[in-house]
UniProtKB/Swiss-Prot annotation:
GO terms for cellular component: plasma membrane. This is Semaphorin-like protein A3. InterPro entries: Ig-like_dom, Ig-like_fold, Semap_dom, Semap_dom_sf, Semaphorin, WD40/YVTN_repeat-like_dom_sf. May act as an immune modulator in host-infected cells.
Length: 653
């Protein structure tokens, strides 16, 4: 054990009395992970406040230093959809609360708003593509009150039509939509909240429906995971989770149906004796789909297979912890390959650095089946807590009582392949995550990440599976809206490769085959790193429109794609300047990941480093003399490849 007496300006190691208070770093975001150096301190109570400040300052400096040194964070290029890419549709009135639905194999997009569902058909012109479905409250007696509106919060495709559910003046109800006509289905508790809010989940799995929405308005402070339809209705205990914020849920169907699981992802408040350390913990919870509730009267309507585990999104090189769960994207493996299902988690650190960590369902399943229970020091009962029962048997009361009192497993879920740091780390605050895995010839060889920022833009990251780099590269920023605004919802159509994204004002269709934005030469096409693009017929082309022989993943190196003469065409200018004058030469920054430098007669005149320059690389020619005469060359260096961009022949007047 280490002993520490801390001040704000300089932490000093000194020996204190063993009677002083013990601080474990689990209060900072994970046991032994705050600084990655010391697990436990004995702290004098008077030093507690200054110690917290010291630790926070050290961690902020560590995070900033690591973020600057390890990778280039900013997007390589920036594209505005108003430049002719994509399509836009406007709502008319402002819609502060929306839900987005896209019908597969069609160009239809539904947006649920206040008393209205908007239908946009992006295959037709904007003048003929909008339909309004009015679904006003059935209890609308006080029009001046927002609580008497009908905010649509759920759109779900069913065999008999589109299910739409809304707040309905605090009397949650649902409607069925067919061919723009609506049928009122009546009150449906658990499918819509009493008022619009985030963090409400509804999961449909075969004949069962799961929900985190409160069934009673008076229990607005209650947070439970429920099964509300299908098999017997069940809910989690009051003590199972501490003020959880639910993010995502999924069903995993295994080879033995009795062992099917429901996994839900959330963050919760952690118990801490030190209020200076606001502490949230990212979690995954599990229940068995076959759970029939308990045997006793106290457990008959409770989940008896609920367990929870911590998701460990950590950079072990720097000790940075990402403890706030923002979003989850689930990549579903093919049928009968459930263990290969991937969980992509978007996290924030306490200082608003973002990270994406990858977990596997196989690892999650292993942790729940093998880990001890946290703070439980006795032999586990048989069957062990969390185990699914065959033939719809009830979990024995003894097993339920242990799991109900000790629902957290001791082992965390680590990143895929025990990775030492997240696949993405960024200074940007990201809010939502989508993932597309690129497949050619039956092999996944690249992963594309779509991340939304708090400013309303989309960042696209790429990681090649066989790359020596373990992190993804930020290749593109997209501004999707005509009117800049935060992004409320985003959907991926991975069949037609479209993104659908909406704000409170508009919805946009973003094509993912943006190959033409990268330039009109092979070098620029290759340097984009976009796995969806290749050089074909003297054009940067969408790979799915090119044959495998010419556009497949074999064309990965610069020489393979572009040949030996890959350099772009050099732009040449001739300028004349007065003697003893000051002039500026500007070299365009065609990539935010490149270094630029001006040379003349083989000597470097000016360097613009990738981590410091923000715009064009400017060369100042001060007090021009005869030595100024000649050709000034702007060069670009990116990934060990150097090419000429610009030649300016300067003569004196």
């Amino acid at each position: 054990m280490a002993y520490l007496n801390a001040t704000v300006s300089k932490p000093v190691i000194s020996l204190l009395s063993l009677s002083k208070k013990v601080l474990k770093f689990e209060h900072c975001g994970g046991e032994g992970q705050c600084l990655g150096l010391i697990t436990e301190f004995v702290i004098h109570p008077a030093a507690m406040g200054t110690l917290c400040v010291s630790i926070r300052l050290l961690m902020i400096l560590s995070a900033i230093t690591a973020a600057k040194s390890r990778f280039i964070d900013k997007p390589r290029l920036i594209v505005n959809l108003t430049d002719g890419f994509g399509q836009h549709r406007f709502f008319g009135p402002q819609e502060p609360h929306t839900v987005l639905f896209h019908s597969l194999n069609s160009s239809d997009v539904y947006v649920g708003g206040n008393n209205t569902i908007y239908l946009f058909d992006f295959a037709h012109s904007s003048n003929a593509s909008t339909a309004l479905i009015n679904i006003t409250s059935t209890h609308n007696t006080h029009r001046l009150s927002s609580t008497c509106e009908n905010f649509i919060t759920l759109l779900h495709n069913q065999t008999d039509g589109l299910l739409a559910c809304g707040t309905n003046s605090q009397k949650p109800s649902c409607w069925l939509i067919n061919n723009l006509t609506t049928q009122f289905l009546g009150p449906k508790l658990g499918l819509a909240p009493f008022s619009p809010s985030s963090g409400n989940l509804v999961l449909f799995d075969q004949n069962d429906t799961y929900s985190t929405i409160n069934l009673y308005k008076s229990l607005s402070g209650s947070h439970k995971f429920r099964r509300i339809a299908g098999q017997v209705e069940l809910y989690t205990s009051d003590t199972a989770m501490h003020r959880p914020q639910f993010v995502q849920a999924t069903a995993v169907h295994k080879n033995e149906s009795y062992d099917d699981k429901i996994y839900f992802f959330f963050q919760e408040n952690s118990h801490s004796d030190f209020k200076q350390f606001p502490h949230t913990v990212p979690r995954v919870g599990q229940v068995c789909s076959s759970d029939q509730g308990g045997e006793s009267s106290l457990s008959v309507y409770k989940w008896t297979t609920f367990l929870k585990a911590r998701l460990a999104c950590v950079d072990y090189d720097t000790g940075r912890i990402y403890n706030e769960l923002q979003d989850i994207f689930i990549w579903q493996a093919p049928e009968n390959s459930w263990e290969e299902t991937l969980i992509y988690g978007l996290f924030l650190s306490p200082w608003n650095f973002s990270a994406v960590c990858v977990f596997t369902v196989k690892d999650i399943d292993h942790v729940f089946k093998t880990s001890k229970l946290k703070n439980y020091h006795h032999k586990l009962p048989t069957p062990r807590p969390g185990q699914c029962m065959k033939n719809h048997q009830h979990v024995p009361t003894e097993t339920f009582q242990v799991a109900d009192r000790y629902p957290e497993v001791a082992d965390p879920v680590y990143q895929k392949n025990n990775a030492m740091f997240p696949i993405i780390q960024s200074k940007y605050i990201y809010t939502k995550l989508l993932v597309y895995r690129v497949e050619y010839g039956g092999v996944f060889w690249a992963t594309i990440f779509y991340l939304t920022t708090i400013k309303g833009t989309i960042h696209i990251y790429v990681r090649y599976e066989d790359s020596n780099s373990t992190t993804a590269l930020n290749i593109l920023e997209i501004n999707p809206f005509q009117k800049p605004a935060p992004i409320q919802n985003i959907l991926l159509d991975n069949t037609n490769l479209k993104l659908y994204v909406n704000s409170e004002w508009e919805v946009s269709e973003v094509p993912l085959d943006l190959c033409s934005v990268y330039g009109n030469d092979c070098f620029s096409c290759f340097m984009s790193r976009d796995p969806l693009c290749t050089w074909y017929n003297n054009t940067c082309s969408f790979k799915q429109r090119v044959s495998v022989e010419t556009g497949g993943p074999a064309n990965r190196t610069l020489s393979e794609m572009c040949g030996d003469h890959y350099a772009p065409t050099v732009v040449k200018h001739q300028v004349s300047i007065p003697l003893l004058s000051n002039s500026y030469l500007s070299c365009p920054a065609v990539s935010n990941h490149a270094d630029y430098f001006w040379t003349k007669d083989g000597f470097t005149e000016k360097r613009c480093h990738v981590k410091t320059h923000k715009n064009d690389c400017i060369l100042l020619i001060a007090n021009s003399t005869t030595a100024t005469n000649g050709t000034h060359v702007c060069n670009m260096k990116e990934d060990s490849v150097t090419v000429k961009l610009l030649e300016v022949n300067v003569t004196l007047m």
